[in-house]
Amino acid sequence: EIRASRIVHHAPGSLPDKPQFAADMMNLFIVVEGGDHHVTILDGDKLEPIHRFPSRYALHGGPKFTPDGRYVFFASRDGWISKFDIWNLKVVAEVRAGINTRNAAVSGDGKYVAVANYLPHSLVILDAELNPLKIHAVRDRFGKQSSRVSAVYTAEPRRSFVAALKDVMEAWEISYDPKAPEIPAGMIHDFQYREGAFIPGFLNPKRSILDDYLDDFFFTQDYNEVMGASREGGKGQVVHLDVRRSIA
């Protein structure tokens, strides 16, 4: 269904590879207008509008950019992911990755997009052209309890996405490095002799076991820990992504 929903307005390579207006491309504001479902591109030097266009319904207020500043990705609350070419002021592709979406994140290299969904309970990985690569049905490590995804963010130095789960006391880290080491699945008797089950490290989750639920979080400066809290818990926690558990 995700693949069938994909709309290509402008194929890759069909638009000019240079900006079509005069402005500092790295000094622009993207203004998401919540009331009337439009987006305005604002010149950061002159504080004047450059372009305004209609958006999908109820965009999330945090659009995500590719490293070169050319593309920006929007997520709507009803699951649509839109890719906008700032240089050409065009929506180039769209796909519906969920029914009730929390937010989206773009990888540090601009090649992947992760989408956090409340409905269905899923974490969707897309390529930069919005083709689905991996759809994770989100369940606990025992495969029993499903969960909504509260948020997903990019940990650029780790080459990974990190997601908080609403209904399971886990945080997931998903590497977008094709050379990521394999992930042990279950009990491992001997890592050296590979006695146990392993899954590919690329685009699969490593689970951190938590003391409480996470609704939202932020990274420490070295990106080795996340700090966050649940809305109902009344206290925060620190999760070490290498130790893969709560440490405080």
Positions of the model-derived regions?
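Predominantly soluble domains enriched in secretory-pathway, periplasmic, or organellar proteins
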Residues: E1-A248
